Amino acid sequence: MSKKTSLTPEEMRREALNTALSTIERKYGSGSVMKLSDDAHTNVAVIPSGSIGLDLALGVGGIPRGRVTEIYGPESSGKTTLALHMIAECQKQGGTAAFIDAEHALDINYARRLGVKTDEMLISQPDYGEQALDIADMLVRSNAVDVVVIDSVAALIPQSELEGNMGETQVGSQARLMSHAMRKLTGTIHKSRTSVIFINQIRMKIGTMGYGSPETTTGGNALKFYCSVRIDVRKIQTLKDKEEVYGNRVRVKIVKNKVAPPFREAQFDILYGQGVSRTGELIDLGVETGIVEKSGAWYAFGSERLGQGKENVRQMLQENTTLREAIEQKLLEHLGMREPVQSADEAEKQD
């Protein structure tokens, strides 16, 4: 007679788990449940933000794909400018971008100046909130769009509110709309690898006293919970040349980050009509890392004297692309954001 093999409790647990996993896969498809070691996509895929400092603060080199990002702040702080830079970076990588303009305020000429290929960008100007979010849902489900920007949450007015009288109150209607939309969108976004960016405004809480910030974002709490990244954008300084204002100094803070450590900050210049000054970032980060030397008001890169005053150096580097690219290459190598360029001799030695 053959002896019946007895299983240890641990083996019985494994067999029960394997049976459950095979049942789940038959019912819901392959990949419904997996070990992290089985997943080939554990590294976070990103879309660069267009700002070296912001990419560094985000910890992964950009905004994550397959997740929701919220950019919020006061008016004219640079929220839409940042989102347009992200669209431009996505298009540089050969991706497809969509802009849902709920505010009906997108400046196409400004977008072009930031590097956005407006002829290739999908744009929608919906009439009400449900339409905007349905369009976003369908674009995400198509698996053919890399980034979707919704500008802004405050402009996503529920249809019931639009059809009501002007003085009629609709308590919590926008929060309910956003809560339902986020429950529906989040799973689809993750599967599609689309990066969805919500631009939001801030409001003052009524009757807030004592502890806590008096500011809050529109659209309820659902967006805060479902976001993987929340970026707070603030204008901290007005840039002037004598009496002429030519831009703003902006501080961004990563107040929530599920893909890297949060609460990192970055500062950079946003110039009117030009967007984020990448050249200005090269100067600031170059001085911070020691790649660009600063003595008084004079700047130097190695033996090359760049000029006196940041604005003069910025203009000089914009004209001298070879020198600007050399500084950028060295800075990105130092920050670990780009592989070092090998010389011909080093390449021959490796071969």
UniProtKB/Swiss-Prot annotation:
Main location: cytoplasm
GO cellular component: cytosol
Localization per Swiss-Prot or TrEMBL: Cytoplasm
Coiled coil: none
PROSITE patterns: RECA_2 (PS50162), RECA_3 (PS50163)
Molecular function terms from GO: ATP binding; ATP hydrolysis activity; ATP-dependent DNA damage sensor activity; damaged DNA binding; single-stranded DNA binding
Transmembrane parts of this sequence: none
Keywords: ATP-binding, Cytoplasm, DNA damage, DNA recombination, DNA repair, DNA-binding, Nucleotide-binding, SOS response
Source species, domain of life: Bacteria
Isomerase in keyword set: no
Keyword hit for Glycoprotein: no
Residues where ATP binds: 73-80
CDD domains tied to this protein: RecA
GO biological process, one term: DNA recombination
Sequence similarity: Belongs to the RecA family.
NCBIfam families reported in the protein's UniProt record: tigrfam_recA
General function of this protein: Can catalyze the hydrolysis of ATP in the presence of single-stranded DNA, the ATP-dependent uptake of single-stranded DNA by duplex DNA, and the ATP-dependent hybridization of homologous single-stranded DNAs. It interacts with LexA causing its activation and leading to its autocatalytic cleavage.
Protein name according to UniProt: Protein RecA
Organism listed in the record: Oleidesulfovibrio alaskensis (strain ATCC BAA-1058 / DSM 17464 / G20) (Desulfovibrio alaskensis)
